[in-house]
Amino acid sequence: MARLLVLACSATKRPDHDRIPALARYDGPLWRTLRAADPDGRCAKVAFLSAHYGFRDAATPIADYDARLTQDLAERMIASGVTTRWPRPPSPRRPDTYGIHAGAEIAGLTRYGAKPFQEIALVGGRLYVDVMHALVRGFVEMGCVRREARVSVINWPIGRMRQDLRAWLAAAPARGDQP
């Protein structure tokens, strides 16, 4: 069964000066739980949602940054859907050729819809989960997530989120059971 974990970014980051994969860059409690519970990345494909980078594959190398998801930014991300590039250009006068849009990223994760996700976990605070839900609706329309996909939301106090994330990862089918 094709599974996708979408995890909110983390304020705690490794301070490496070079770009490193988001999976290594983010160092908050949920990211540490992910690395401990699924060190080989076999339980699910992992993506992240960032106030700066938008929706990306967790293997994407990213630079260190400091940005918070505000209500205003969350509303703009929801309104812009899966076709707006993140990060946004540094100036409105610059061409919109910065970053990548969520639709392109999910297409790559699903082999352009050939292997749509059947199970998804959305993990993060309320604003992040709101944006994630909007993106998933767009991914369904693109054919990259099945309409009947099971969507789990993990949004509690941090200790409970860590337990639920670990349990969701542990519930993955055995490697041989996946198509």
What do these predicted regions represent?
Residues M1-P179:
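Peripheral peptide segments
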